[in-house]
């Protein structure tokens, strides 16, 4: 079945265009509500959101959909995605919903669904809900329509849970930190967590107006953070994205520390504390070969999945693994969370920094990354990867990289793009291979 509504991370799109309209959101609420109404108890759904202007519209539409099929609704307001996952489980809700388009601009929005266990829904569950969206809803009798209430202590509950991931014996009172919340969901909770743990906190991106989420700020654009770290002589910078499920670190020299380096540090620390189950770390095919080589020297296997934190989490659950993530900054620690949590990941980095008595630049650049180049080629029609000349160029490149690098070529799941990525110790070889394949794809497209 072709998926009309659900993509790689829930439902996402430009606001007021299919599928991100009020009408579709209401029907998603009705379909998901009917699907999760199992058993004879009163059924409850928890709904959180980030700071986009359209969040009000989507929240109201979902609330109408869920209550119309007899589900009670708990509204928690702006809260990071991992906070919604956490509260869904702790409040014994049948379903959790996060209204967010993550790192996308304010004009986009999305709907992410979590099961009662706090994990994102499986593709099978999404398929069942998708099939019901365009069907007549199973409306509740007038006396059975759901109720809605807003709770005020959701942020406090999440703050407490995040702080519990940080060793009780440690404090951050010797650190000056710059924190960029991307004008997003963590704009209140993240500064509170760091302040309560004793840090001096200098904030960026904490004045959301509905339109400025991820706008030249946050983990996808840490340039302002880098500048502020240098200006204030801070010990470290932390950049979250719009829904705070990913994090990028900046050291005291203004250098970026990506998700691969964060995973390397956390995996090393977890291994020492016997928390690295199966001596395995899970990452995607985009993670740098340098990470794989570094972990291998420690006897740690790197298990690679398709791109997307959903695939990382699925592999972690299937193998019972505890540490995983993506180069983009999604870090999943199953002994603390069920989904990526930028703030929890940042606290693990800070714990290591406090205990090491080193500067961030000395601690956080754990391995030397291989030169890596990624380019996108847009195509208009057809299957350019099946073209004979493209296949030949790919075969030649794979032969050139044999034993000394990696080549990854894939079609985008959301746009008509071919993504070409190569990495090797020789940067000239990397550029030569990527440019040649891109040009061959352009001619074939």
From Swiss-Prot:
Catalytic activity: alpha-D-glucosamine 1-phosphate = D-glucosamine 6-phosphate
Protein name, UniProt field: Phosphoglucosamine mutase
Positions that bind Mg(2+): 102, 241, 243, 245
CC terms in the record's Gene Ontology section: cytosol
Domain of life per record: Bacteria
Active-site positions on this chain: 102
Database matches in Pfam families: PGM_PMM_I, PGM_PMM_II, PGM_PMM_III, PGM_PMM_IV
Residues bearing the modification Phosphoserine: 102
Co-factor: note: Binds 1 Mg(2+) ion per subunit.
GO BP: carbohydrate metabolic process; peptidoglycan biosynthetic process; UDP-N-acetylglucosamine biosynthetic process
Cofactor: Mg(2+)
Example of a GO MF term: magnesium ion binding
Enzyme Commission designation: 5.4.2.10
PTM statement from Swiss-Prot or TrEMBL: Activated by phosphorylation.
Keywords: Isomerase, Magnesium, Metal-binding, Phosphoprotein
Similarity remark: Belongs to the phosphohexose mutase family.
Function as written in the Swiss-Prot or TrEMBL entry: Catalyzes the conversion of glucosamine-6-phosphate to glucosamine-1-phosphate.
